């Protein structure tokens, strides 16, 4: 059995973490070794970088600084968690990965795709997710959900225009590579979203055992 790398993507309030946990439980019912992780973060060092990225601050963070911190955390995460798990045949479920960088730093911050792609190749080599679930919903719905959770982090404090650009970047990436991306309507009820995940489950299990 070969490892499978599945990422869950989407803007704020899309329910990625909840549905990552749901998918993990369903895969474990099939006896699969599942590793749950997230970005930025996933290791103690990468989690400290996450704190730098998310904590509101009086000092404005340059877009290039943000981008480099994201990839620094990712390099550690790949070395310590993702690559070892895939090597032993596990299913890795990651809440955000490099698609988020193209969406947030590319779409939201306006950094060039070429700059991001250069770092992607340097840090990841040929490693890309096998499957990416994109949880899509209107920006105003996602921001309302995020606000209901409590104190907003540095990204969640951005305005609607930023998140519209993030959403469009995700949708464009999903449209360009439909063989890798599955687009899910996250504006539905949680039960409806999880029914959509269940519909994908047989194909995922088959790929894990193939």
Swiss-Prot record:
Annotated protein name in UniProt:
Thymidylate kinase
| InterPro entries in the record | P-loop_NTPase, Thymidylate_kin-like_dom, Thymidylate_kinase
Q: What superkingdom does the record give?
A: Bacteria
Entry GO CC: cytosol
Give the EC number. 2.7.4.9
**Gene for this chain:** tmk
Free-text function comment from the UniProt entry:
Phosphorylation of dTMP to form dTDP in both de novo and salvage pathways of dTTP synthesis.
Q: Which GO terms describe its biological process?
A: dTDP biosynthetic process; dTTP biosynthetic process; dUDP biosynthetic process
Q: Which reaction does it catalyse?
A: dTMP + ATP = dTDP + ADP
List ligand-binding residues for ATP. Answer: 10-17
Tell me which NCBIfam families the record gives. Answer: DTMP_kinase (TIGR00041)
The record's SUPFAM superfamilies line, in alphabetical order, gives:
P-loop containing nucleoside triphosphate hydrolases (SSF52540)
Q: What family classification does the UniProt entry report for this protein?
A: Belongs to the thymidylate kinase family.
Keyword list (alphabetical) reads:
ATP-binding, Kinase, Nucleotide biosynthesis, Nucleotide-binding, Transferase
What CDD domains does its record include? TMPK
Q: Name one GO molecular function term.
A: dTMP kinase activity
